[in-house]
Amino acid sequence: LTTIAEPEAVELATKYILPEDHPYRVIASAGGETFLVYHLDEKGGIQNIHTGNKCASGTGEFFLQQLRRMDISLDEVAAMEIPETPLKVSSRCSVFCKSDCTHALNKGEEKASVIAGLSNMMSDKLIELFQTISMDHVLLVGGCAGNKAMAHFLRQKVRDLHIPDESHCFEALG
């Protein structure tokens, strides 16, 4: 099978699912292993790519590991109400983040608050990648786009956040 590089796949998927005159100049890819932000030019080509640090905290896989530790499924997370005030968790290191979650749960903190804290931290990780890019029109893709709490916290920070139906398979679509 022929393969293409991920940035090229992102360009092709964008052109496939969005109309030519779409306003989106930023694609935030929130995946299981990495978070990336693609800055698009006016023709939909990738102008720049910003990647996060290699720490696992804030990635989809880390989020899933924490859910397993709490014995909560993704379906249960999807049905949860998002607390107004999420637990503050460290975004600097997965060990510190895991420790914050463990201590909070041991002190009786609600699981929903811990999950909201993790989701808010994930949204902050993406925001850090925007650097000097406008956050006016952002397309959110990747498996983590299905995390409604993360999307909720991103919407508080981004003026126009769009999550396409194909977000979970966006790169593969390209």
Named regions from a protein language model:
Residues L1, Y16, L36-E42, I49-T51, ...:
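Short acidic, glycine/serine/threonine-rich loops at helix termini
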Residues L1-G31, L36-D41, I127, L173-G174:
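Conserved phosphate-binding catalytic cores of ATP/NTP-utilizing and phosphoryl-transfer enzymes
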Residues T2-E8, L154-L173:
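Conserved phosphate-binding/catalytic loops in two-lobed NTP-binding clefts
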Residues G45-P86, H168-E171:
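Glycine-rich phosphate-binding loop plus the immediately following alpha-helix
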Residues C97-Q131:
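Adenine-nucleotide phosphate-binding core of ATP-dependent small-molecule kinases
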